[in-house]
Amino acid sequence: MARRYLLEFEKPLVELEKQIEQIRELARDSEVDVSQQLLQLETLAARRREEIFNALTPAQKIQVARHPQRPSTLDFIQMFCDDWVELHGDRNCSDDKALIGGIARIEEKSVLVIGQQKGRDTKENVARNFGMAKPGGYRKALRLMNHADRFKLPIISFIDTPGAYAGLLAEEQGQGEAIAVNLREMFRLRVPIISTVIGEGGSGGALGIGVADRLLMFEHSVYTVASPEACASILWRDAGKAPDAAAALKITGSDLMALGIVDEVLSEPSGGNNWAPLKAGEVLKESLIRNLRELDSLSIRQLRDKRYEKFRQMGRFLEPSSLDEELIT
């Protein structure tokens, strides 16, 4: 069994995990019946894990969203997408591996799937540029979305990026323009679009494939205008204030539901999606099918009008509370 990567706030579970592994090894190496002891320890570990995850701060949710074993775009595709065929290239000069896309079927319904893809280890992350797409990635996504529009395929996008790549070459190649064009063109598409934040939803990098009729989000995912570290560095010149920035930015599913940004927050297994990826896949698949069914009942005009109106409603603001004022002073 692959060793679990535990986050700092999960360290109280380390000793229990060791005991559970020892008992499993004992059961494999002998005929001693340890099922009762194993059940007791697993129940205790599950209860403590649930207590920890029910009290996560926004800063801790970011750690969960960035967990190296959290299911990725390709993981979810393998879980519930049949006949997956990846499509490559922006038909200009690149094939960005940080943003993938292709045709698949979900419950006999043909769809276009696009999404950012991170790596599992350093080598994969370098190849995938840590999920940070360059201009070619967004142009590839737009090419595929236009393909979907032409053939009347609903679009499913999975968002998982710290942000669009901000390197010099990316800026020279028109990173801002590529994202801006995607925003404009996605409002014009005549097919249903469902976006899901499966991990990090960072800044314009997320928005580049995030103009959707329905925006879903896992409960331990985050969706933010800027990373808390960057925000703290800008506001206070101190990245150590990232937890304060995380609280002020309203990056969690519950906050974004209250603000009318997110349409649905998907529940995660106890401990996060990395503890039970298949269960997370079942939850996501059910929601996608349900939302696709609802959107299919709308005419093209209704679809585009509602999508436009949804984003026009964003940007409302509240007067800052005393706590917010303390955070920004």
UniProtKB/Swiss-Prot annotation:
Which GO BP annotation is one of this protein's?
fatty acid biosynthetic process
Q: Where are the transmembrane segments?
A: none
* Location(s) in or outside the cell: Cytoplasm
GO CC annotations? Answer: acetyl-CoA carboxylase complex
GO terms (molecular function) for this protein are: acetyl-CoA carboxylase activity; ATP binding; carboxyl- or carbamoyltransferase activity
Q: Which UniProt keywords apply?
A: ATP-binding, Cytoplasm, Fatty acid biosynthesis, Fatty acid metabolism, Lipid biosynthesis, Lipid metabolism, Nucleotide-binding, Transferase
Q: What is its EC number?
A: 2.1.3.15
- Domain CoA carboxyltransferase C-terminal: residue ranges: 40-294
| Pathway named in the protein's UniProt entry | Lipid metabolism; malonyl-CoA biosynthesis; malonyl-CoA from acetyl-CoA: step 1/1
What is the annotated role of this protein in its UniProt record?
Component of the acetyl coenzyme A carboxylase (ACC) complex. First, biotin carboxylase catalyzes the carboxylation of biotin on its carrier protein (BCCP) and then the CO(2) group is transferred by the carboxyltransferase to acetyl-CoA to form malonyl-CoA.
Write down the HAMAP family for this protein, in alphabetical order. Answer: AcetylCoA_CT_alpha
- Family as reported in the entry's similarity comment: Belongs to the AccA family.
The record describes its quaternary structure and partners as: Acetyl-CoA carboxylase is a heterohexamer composed of biotin carboxyl carrier protein (AccB), biotin carboxylase (AccC) and two subunits each of ACCase subunit alpha (AccA) and ACCase subunit beta (AccD).
According to UniProt, the name of this protein is Acetyl-coenzyme A carboxylase carboxyl transferase subunit alpha
The gene designation is accA
